[in-house]
A protein has these predicted regions:
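Tandem repeat scaffolds
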Residues: 1-351
């Protein structure tokens, strides 16, 4: 089949099925709206081709050049795009399911509002890509290069991100649910409004990062370093933060309800109006921290070090304080157990 015959068949609405187009020059060709079933494009030149709103089922693109291709609203199922060039491609609203993009070059591509479902993108280059509102569900993203990428409102669910590169990437209102970022160096980065619910961030370095309004609900932050972070209004509810370091962090009006902070270090942190209700703070260090107006109701502070902490109007309702250190902490300015609240909590209906 020649290039001209292919273009004409697509214009006529014919389904292109099990055709071998290996090595064909289709650069700049208008293939928009085409339906391709198990077509081989190995080594083909598709540079700048128009594939808008086309449908591909099990296509073979190995060795093909798809740079600057227009794939807006294109649908691909089980596509082999491993190692191909998709540099500067337009993939807005494209949907790729079970695609193999391992080692592919998508640098500079626009994938805004695209969906990558169960895609394999190991070692792929997505530097400087636009991933605004892009969905990546159950994607294999190990070793992916996302440096300089725009990840504003990107959705990543159950994605494997071990070894990913985020240098200069822009995160804002991004959803990173149940992702694995353990051990990564994310120091100094901006994650404003990002949701890390259920994420594995154990051992991660977030020193100096901006976590304003970020959510780490049910996340694993054990052994993580969050020194000097800005995390006002952040949420750490039910997070595992054992032995984490948050020294000198700005955590004003942050929520730690039911979090496990055993062995964590929050020395010198700004914690005014933060909530630690029902949190576990065994052997946690709050030395010199500002905990004015904090709420530690029902918290376990056994063995915690509250030395020199500011506790003005801090709620200490029914805390556990065995072996807790209060040296020069101004505990007298705090609020102890509220008898009326305690009575209400203990009330049981008569049988």
């Amino acid at each position: 089949m020649t290039r001209e015959e292919l273009i004409q068949k697509i214009k006529d609405g014919e389904i292109i099925s099990k055709v071998d187009l290996t090595g064909m020059d289709l650069s700049g060709a208008n293939l928009s709206g085409g339906i391709f079933e198990e077509v081989r494009f190995q080594g083909a030149n598709l540079r700048g081709a128009d594939l808008r709103e086309s449908i591909f089922t099990k296509p073979e693109f190995s060795g093909a050049d798809l740079s600057s291709v227009n794939m807006r609203s294109t649908v691909m199922t089980e596509a082999n795009l491993a190692g191909v060039s998709l540099k500067n491609a337009c993939m807005i609203e494209a949907k790729l399911t079970d695609a193999d993009l391992s080692g592919a070059d998508l640098s500079g591509a626009d994938l805004s509002t695209a969906a990558l479902i169960s895609a394999t993108m190991k070692e792929a280059n997505l530097s400087n890509t636009n991933l605004d509102h892009t969905v990546m569900h159950e994607a294999q993203l190990q070793g992916i290069n996302l440096s300089g990428a725009n990840l504003a409102q990107t959705v990543m669910i159950d994605a494997a991100l071990e070894g990913a590169v985020f240098t200069g990437a822009k995160f804002h209102l991004t959803m990173m649910l149940n992702v694995n970022l353990s051990g990564m160096d994310l120091s100094g980065m901006q994650f404003t409004g990002v949701q890390f619910k259920g994420a594995d961030l154990s051992g991660v370095n977030l020193t100096g990062a901006d976590l304003t309004q970020a959510s780490f609900m049910e996340a694993n932050l054990s052994e993580a370093v969050l020194d000097q972070v800005k995390a006002q209004y952040a949420i750490f509810m039910q997070a595992k933060m054992t032995n984490a370091s948050l020294k000198g962090a700005f955590l004003k009006q942050t929520t730690f309800g039911e979090a496990d902070l055993t062995g964590a270090d929050l020395s010198g942190s700004e914690l005014e109006s933060s909530v630690f209700e029902k949190s576990v703070c065994k052997a946690t260090r709050f030395t010199g921290a500002n905990m004015t107006y904090c709420d530690f109701s029902h918290a376990d502070l056994s063995g915690a070090d509250m030395s020199r902490a500011r506790l003005f109007r801090t709620k200490l309702h029914r805390i556990k304080e065995e072996y807790t250190r209060w040296d020069a902490a101004g505990k007298k300015t705090a609020l102890g157990t509220d008898p009326e609240r305690a009575e209400a909590e203990d009330w049981k209906p008569q049988v």
